[in-house]
């Protein structure tokens, strides 16, 4: 598989064309951002860790019959993926109150929710990715109601699989954000990544944060936290 022209450079990943028009190579960078890019740093090995963690998680999701864009992991930083048309939406799943939900609704961070909360945001940097509802998404042309039904069905399955996976690692899956895309064949699949960059992960015993909040909140120790998540996932895989 030959890597060709750069197609897209994002906050934490770069996407390259290949000699197969239906496939792309996703390269994980070491950039860390917060506040929609307002805060930025380069943290050695972060991209390698996220690539390894995402690979393990997508393997678990594949075993649960959840379709993803991942084909194979090529090396420390790169994955071969299906080329998809990304829905301009972020789907956020909240199992515990944290982050913007706590601020927006005046709820105490760490409160366990009786019901899982799904949110969608419109991916638009100029608008700071506003929170929208299903009707907004359809009015914007971002997705159809049928698309959203499929996305929510997949999201529920993903949350169940990930919650069980992390619980087995003694980690609480507080919340996470995911993206979906449509393949050339028309199938809606999970795209992008699932890593401590995109999840809030708290140690079950100590509530120690094992995610990008260590960067957002200037707590330090980001790579140590990501390595710990990877270690626990790898240990679980060996058992």
Swiss-Prot record:
Coiled coil: none annotated. GO terms for molecular function: ATP binding; phosphoribosylaminoimidazolesuccinocarboxamide synthase activity. It is an enzyme of class 6 (ligase). InterPro entries: SAICAR_synt/ADE2_N (IPR028923), SAICAR_synt_PurC (IPR033934), SAICAR_synth (IPR001636), SAICAR_synthetase (IPR050089), SAICAR_synthetase_CS (IPR018236). Its EC number is 6.3.2.6. Pfam families: SAICAR_synt. Keywords: ATP-binding, Ligase, Nucleotide-binding, Purine biosynthesis. It catalyses: 5-amino-1-(5-phospho-D-ribosyl)imidazole-4-carboxylate + L-aspartate + ATP = (2S)-2-[5-amino-1-(5-phospho-beta-D-ribosyl)imidazole-4-carboxamido]succinate + ADP + phosphate + 2 H(+). Belongs to the SAICAR synthetase family. This is Phosphoribosylaminoimidazole-succinocarboxamide synthase. It comes from Dichelobacter nodosus (strain VCS1703A). The gene is purC.
């Amino acid at each position: 598989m030959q890597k060709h022209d750069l197609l897209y450079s994002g906050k934490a990943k770069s996407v390259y064309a290949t000699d197969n028009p239906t496939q792309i190579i996703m390269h994980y960078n070491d950039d860390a951002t917060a506040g929609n890019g307002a805060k930025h740093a380069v943290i050695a090995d972060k991209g390698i860790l996220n690539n390894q963690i995402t690979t393990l998680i997508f393997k678990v999701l594949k075993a649960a019959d959840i379709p993803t864009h991942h084909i194979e992991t090529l090396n420390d930083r790169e994955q071969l993926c299906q080329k998809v048309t990304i829905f301009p939406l972020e789907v956020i799943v909240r199992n515990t109150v944290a982050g913007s939900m706590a601020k927006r609704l005046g709820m105490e961070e760490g409160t366990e929710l009786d019901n899982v909360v799904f949110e969608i945001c419109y991916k638009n940097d100029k608008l700071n990715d506003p929170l929208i509802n299903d009707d907004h998404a359809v009015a914007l042309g971002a997705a159809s109601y049928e698309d959203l039904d499929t996305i929510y069905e997949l999201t529920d399955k993903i949350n169940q699989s990930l919650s069980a996976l992390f619980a087995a690692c003694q980690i609480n899956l507080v919340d996470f954000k995911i993206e979906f895309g449509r393949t050339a064949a028309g199938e809606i699949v999970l795209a992008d990544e699932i890593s401590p960059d995109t999840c809030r992960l708290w140690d079950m015993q100590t509530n120690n944060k094992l995610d990008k909040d260590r960067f957002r909140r200037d707590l330090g120790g980001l790579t140590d936290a990501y390595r710990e998540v990877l270690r626990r996932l790898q240990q679980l895989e060996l058992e």
